[in-house]
């Protein structure tokens, strides 16, 4: 799923006043978290380095693949929209949906990828 596809989907499902550059920033934050907390800690990570997205990256594929991408990215963007609008009840529902989808992806990733070995160092 590309950045543009998820932004168009969320704008269709939840019309809002936020510009694409704000949503791209939110997606960068989410993918940076996924990269640092999950992907980078396992062997065979298909991403060597993640620096975030810019407005020129709208056709770029997001890091989390289907079938998880749709639920994770849409729920996350909707939660950010709700939070910024001060709609806390809606935010709680959206962030709960996001947390559930993100945890499901994390568990699947952990099952399919071996964690990197941890080097033990002794300090004298």
Regions found by a protein language model. Give the residues of each.
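Short helix-capping/linker segments at secondary-structure and domain boundaries
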Residues: 81-91
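Elongated alpha-helical scaffolds
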Residues: 67-76, 80
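Short secondary-structure subsegments characteristic of cysteine-rich extracellular domains
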Residues: 92-106
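Conserved short "hinge" loops at termini or chain/domain junctions
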Residues: 1-62, 103-124
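Generic detector of ordered secondary-structure context
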Residues: 22, 69-70, 90
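Short loop/turn segments at secondary-structure transitions that flank enzyme active sites
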Residues: 1-3, 80-83
